């Protein structure tokens, strides 16, 4: 047996909207770990 014989599921992180794209309320803009991209005015942050 080996010590590195496991793999995690993909987390699908990153930016989810394109430049100048119209979005509706409640849509996901970025999925990230930590706060690499900081939220701006009228943007909420969820866990």
From Swiss-Prot:
Any one GO MF annotation of this record: structural constituent of ribosome
GO CC annotation, single: cytosolic large ribosomal subunit
Pfam families per the UniProt record, alphabetical: Ribosomal_L27
Domain of life according to the entry: Eukaryota
Location of this chain's protein in the cell: Plastid, Chloroplast
Keywords assigned: Chloroplast, Plastid, Ribonucleoprotein, Ribosomal protein
Segments traversing the membrane: none
PANTHER family: LARGE RIBOSOMAL SUBUNIT PROTEIN BL27M (PTHR15893:SF0), RIBOSOMAL PROTEIN L27 (PTHR15893)
InterPro entries: Ribosomal_bL27 (IPR001684), Ribosomal_bL27_CS (IPR018261)
SUPFAM superfamilies tied to this protein: Ribosomal L27 protein-like
GO biological process, one term: translation
Protein name: Large ribosomal subunit protein bL27c-2
Gene designation per UniProt: rpl27
Family according to the record: Belongs to the bacterial ribosomal protein bL27 family.
